[in-house]
């Protein structure tokens, strides 16, 4: 049943850690909704900046947000002007003191979320789905991935009936908990409807004692 479960959630506490790191008792649901609001806002606001992951850490009335992106320059802006504007917007949204930490994703070809978004973008630009999948698989393997699987689901190529097609190269061990598997999901909004794109990238095994 390894293919039915989210590979990131499956490995939490084993080789992966949580994207939200804070503790609360009475305010738990309020802070959880605030996290969702922050993530949705940042995803929309930084749509063209290639954001892969957003981590949130909290302490008292402060929040530290780590943004992992393929294009840090776009978020930081000239002399940090953009990042200051973003900080003010987030502070207004949450009524909290916000610290932003922008981290660069050095190899976007090995980041499942960025690969999924790239395939979705190509599908929106009417690139043939098989070509888009194959191109992403080839470039990920070239940059050192041990295995990759891309699944596209929907009205592929404008077909009357929706279907699911996938393409895999290398190993993608879904049951092995020590396997470092990255997972990403994106949606392509085409004229025929929405096409879902799922990407699984196997980067190697994490041995005990390593993180």
Curated annotation (Swiss-Prot):
Residues covered by the KH type-2 domain: 38-106
Gene Ontology CC terms: cytosolic small ribosomal subunit
GO biological process: translation
Coiled-coil parts of chain: none
Pfam family, one: KH_2
Top-level division of the source organism's lineage: Bacteria
Keywords for this protein: Ribonucleoprotein, Ribosomal protein, RNA-binding, rRNA-binding
Molecular function via GO: mRNA binding; rRNA binding; structural constituent of ribosome
Matching Gene3D superfamilies: 3.30.300.20, Ribosomal protein S3, C-terminal domain
SUPFAM superfamilies associated with the record: Prokaryotic type KH domain (KH-domain type II) (SSF54814), Ribosomal protein S3 C-terminal domain (SSF54821)
Ribosomal protein among keywords: yes
Subunit structure: Part of the 30S ribosomal subunit. Forms a tight complex with proteins S10 and S14.
HAMAP family: Ribosomal_uS3_B
Function: Binds the lower part of the 30S subunit head. Binds mRNA in the 70S ribosome, positioning it for translation.
Homology family: Belongs to the universal ribosomal protein uS3 family.
Protein name as catalogued: Small ribosomal subunit protein uS3
Organism the protein comes from: Geobacter sulfurreducens (strain ATCC 51573 / DSM 12127 / PCA)
């Amino acid at each position: 049943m390894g293919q039915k479960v989210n590979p990131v959630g499956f490995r939490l506490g084993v080789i992966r850690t949580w994207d939200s790191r804070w503790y609360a008792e009475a305010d738990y649901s309020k802070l959880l909704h605030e996290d969702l609001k922050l993530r949705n806002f940042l995803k929309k606001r930084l749509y063209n900046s290639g954001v892969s992951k957003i981590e949130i850490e909290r302490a008292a009335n402060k929040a530290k947000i780590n943004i992992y992106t393929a294009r840090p320059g776009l978020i930081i802006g000239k002399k940090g002007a953009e990042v200051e504007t973003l900080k003010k917007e987030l502070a207004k949204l949450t009524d909290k003191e916000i610290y932003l930490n922008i981290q660069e994703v050095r190899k976007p070809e090995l980041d499942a979320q960025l690969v999924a978004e790239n395939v979705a973008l190509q599908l929106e630009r009417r690139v043939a789905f098989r070509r888009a999948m194959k191109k992403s698989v080839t470039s990920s393997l070239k940059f050192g991935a041990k295995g990759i699987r891309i699944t596209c689901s929907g009205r592929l190529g404008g077909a009357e009936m929706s279907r699911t097609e996938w393409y895999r190269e290398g190993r993608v061990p879904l049951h092995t908990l020590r396997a470092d598997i990255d997972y990403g999901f994106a949606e392509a909004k085409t004229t025929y409807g929405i096409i879902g794109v799922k990407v699984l990238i196997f980067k190697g095994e994490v041995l005990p004692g390593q993180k």
